Amino acid sequence: PDDSVPTQLPSESMTTEATTPSQPANPQPVSQKPAQPTSQSVSQSNSQSVSQSTSQPSSQPTSQPINQADSMVGLKIAVAQQQFIVGDVINNAKKMVELAKDARDKGANIIVFPELSLLGYPPEDLLLRPSLASRVKLAFELLYTVKDIVMLVGYPHIDPNGTFNSVAIIHNGQQKGFYHKQCLPNYGVFDERRYFNTGHNQVLFDYQGLPIGLLICEDLWQDAPIRTLKEKGAEIIISLNASPFEQNKQEQRKALLKSRATEHNIPIVYANSVGGQDDLVFDGGSMVVNAQGKIVQEAPRFLQHTLYVVARHDAQSGQVILSEQRKSPLALSQIAETYQALVVGLRDYVNHSGFKG
């Protein structure tokens, strides 16, 4: 229930600070550039039309500028590898508010949350409840209280055309735009086609002249979405994910990100979920890969953690340069990662179920 306070994973006390911190849609592309260096803007462009009728608040894309007081010496992105409880929409939103404020105070310009983080993953038949839309609306009102940082929030978008696995672009009390997941997995533990409609809106949003492309999990495992974003001018990709643990899965993710980054010559920010939910365990391992396929930032496995990276546009090379972390987390052996998965899965099942003793 929304008024409960679920037991959370222990948070890692240390965050990886990057060096030199800075402080549905219309079918025709919208492009706005800031008029001066101190004006930061977000605008959205879509390749195809989607429904503009929705029960969610302020979900129609806009090109209203984002203005902030300080000029940007680098775009600082916070990757919130955190646990969000399935169905606990209001408390999930409250947690996002606190995380966003903390990231803003550390100089972040954007904070990225995992796939469907507002509702939790996998939500399954909760998506069929008529009350869901009103609960999401209340949660958005909480998110709108955060100022001076862009929030990329995974949420269920519900309108007369269906239910979509989406990401909202939120800033200063407004939803500036949204993106609907295009590739819905329907194999193994995934059953997304039962609940979600396929999205068709390729989304770029502009931040201080830097075109950012958005993807959600399975979109990255297929080549077409990232290829299209690159062709439309994206210079960095941000992907929201709820990728569950399997043995050797982290190595598969790393291989995928390196391949996508080098093939399309574009850096990728990969935000993953963490924690146990019923029969699934999410192992985190969020990371940032540069255009040459090098992992420049990596979060620890099985721990809540906020990762920071600074992206700067290099005038000479024309590429986005990413800050590198000073020390990578220790790699886990297959035995160690399996043990951690068992511990997290059992602990969170007991805690979420409210068992005593």
Which residues does each PLM region occupy?
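Enzyme catalytic cores with a strong preference for nitrogen-chemistry domains
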Residues: 1-10, 14-34, 39, 44, ...
